[in-house]
Design a protein with these regions (language model features):
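Catalytic phosphate/nucleotide-handling subdomain of diverse soluble enzymes
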Residues: 95, 108-181
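Gly/Ser/Thr-rich active-site cleft segment
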Residues: 1-110
Length: 181
């Protein structure tokens, strides 16, 4: 599930007791990473998509405050860039899976960004684009730098960090893509 900021805001209003008992606000893959490594973390794309600043590749104190989640800020895990950092598979999980303890585990970026990377969206020096059609339709273009990011007057879409420092993807989504085929 994405959009953690608004989800936490809803929980603050309708399920405050659950939010008060919470230790960390994980995305699904972040919870898996925690169970594999014992490290509470999220990646730059999840932090930006939740309530972050794409320029900083991290959560934004200003956005968290605007959402009214200052008291819940500690629930957001630290941001770890899986292109640079890994953590070892825990001894217990290794034993349960029949794997060697300490194998590096990498925290991946959001699926849509990884799909765009695989489709060839990353092409420095070119204004490339791609569309991903699944349950959601993502229409994306690549930006070589923060200076190339152009926010539109309608304030639609969003900007995600790419798994290469200083690069971005601007995105518009259609939340029912394959239903329209």
């Amino acid at each position: 599930a994405c959009d953690q900021g608004p989800q936490m805001l809803w929980m603050k209003k309708y399920q405050p007791e659950i939010l008060k008992e919470s230790a960390t606000a994980f995305h699904c893959k972040d919870w898996l990473y925690f169970n594999l490594t014992g490290v509470r973390a999220t990646d730059p794309t999840e932090s930006v998509f939740s309530c972050g600043d794409f320029r900083e590749r991290d959560f934004s104190d200003e956005v968290i405050e605007l959402l009214g989640l200052t008291e819940q800020k500690a629930l957001f895990p630290k941001v770890v860039d899986g292109t640079k950092v890994s953590h070892p598979l825990s001894d217990n999980v290794a034993r349960l899976c029949g794997l060697q303890s300490g194998i590096p585990v990498v925290l991946g970026y959001v699926d849509v960004i990884c799909t765009a990377l695989g489709s060839g969206l990353y092409d420095p020096g070119y204004q490339t684009g791609c569309t991903i059609i699944g349950s959601t339709g993502m229409h994306m273009r690549y930006d070589d730098s923060v200076d190339e990011v152009k926010l539109n007057q309608e304030s639609t879409g969003y900007t995600m960090v790419f798994p290469v420092d200083g690069t971005y993807s601007q995105m518009q989504s259609n939340m029912a893509a394959t239903l329209n085929i």
